[in-house]
Amino acid sequence: MQRHLISAADLTRDDAVLILDTAEEMARVADRPIKKLPTLRGRTVVNLFFEDSTRTRISFEAAEKRLSADVINFTAKGSSVSKGESLKDTAQTLEAMGVDAVVIRHSASGAPYRLATSGWIDAAVVNAGDGTHQHPTQALLDAFTMRRRLVGRDAGLGKDLDGRRITLVGDILHSRVARSNVDLLHTLGAEVTLVAPPTLLPVGVETWPCEVSYDLDSTLPKSDAVMLLRVQRERMNAAFFPTEREYSRRYGLDGDRMAKMPDHAIVMHPGPMVRGMEITAEVADSDRCTVVEQVTNGVSIRMAVLYLLLGGNEPAVSHARPIEEK
């Protein structure tokens, strides 16, 4: 493992499998009466969020606290950033406080890389989402969910997703989740297909390690997992499709379309979902939908990432003693 986690593309196959295997052990903590390990006791982790977040911020905070880290939550609103303070000044302030790791979400693509390589701060940096660029821990938790469902919890240990067929549907253009998943799933040996209207595909997508299709119905019968992506209107300044109804008709997943998928196939969504647009309530509430599992798995993945970045060399959680209740 490198010192930072900035992009899913930076991970080797062995790195990714190590994280997934470590997360499998971290998941056992959730079954304990006391959901806590002493692994990062005495370490300080800062959640540096310049962009609104619910799931990711809470997930990281839960992961940090379960590892016994000291947690500092920073949001741009109400801080000196709202008064014009730069990322450099903020980083140097955190450096002066002696933090060990920074989890950063930023609207500017490349901000986590800048923080990690600038020399402003001597700490591990984890990218929690930067603009439309990358969201590596989301890709890892998605791959973790796929491996658990498609290979098995115990059977999946040490294994990747070789030969699995994954379909990503929706707003690829504005999605850091799509980019991260394509990078990681390719590294893990999966075959990825993107399905979207031409207006929601980025320039240069033909160079990505995946296939591109405009026909969802022809792709579904060949998919082991289908991941639906929200249309990110907050990043749009023009009309990318005629109407929501037309988009849903061509690219939304309903019960009839889900029936075309293989019996073992799963439906995924990184959240937040827009029911009635990219996914119907029937599909979202079905047993094949893994949205809630993804949230649960996100905590385990982020525990694994923090553990490995801050000194862990191998999956050793099963040998660690839980903190005794006082």
Swiss-Prot record:
Q: Which reaction does it catalyse?
A: carbamoyl phosphate + L-aspartate = N-carbamoyl-L-aspartate + phosphate + H(+)
Which residues does the record give as carbamoyl phosphate binding sites?
55-56, 105, 135, 138, 271-272
Q: Which InterPro entries match?
A: Asp/Orn_carbamoyltranf_P-bd, Asp/Orn_carbamoylTrfase, Asp/Orn_carbamoylTrfase_sf, Asp_carbamoyltransf, Asp_carbamoyltransf_Asp/Orn-bd
Q: Which UniProt keywords apply?
A: Pyrimidine biosynthesis, Transferase
Give the molecular function GO annotations: amino acid binding; aspartate carbamoyltransferase activity
What top-level class of enzyme does the UniProt entry assign? transferase
Q: What does this protein do?
A: Catalyzes the condensation of carbamoyl phosphate and aspartate to form carbamoyl aspartate and inorganic phosphate, the committed step in the de novo pyrimidine nucleotide biosynthesis pathway.
- Write the protein's name: Aspartate carbamoyltransferase catalytic subunit
**Originating organism:** Streptomyces coelicolor (strain ATCC BAA-471 / A3(2) / M145)
Lineage, uppermost ranks: Bacteria, Bacillati, Actinomycetota, Actinomycetes, Kitasatosporales
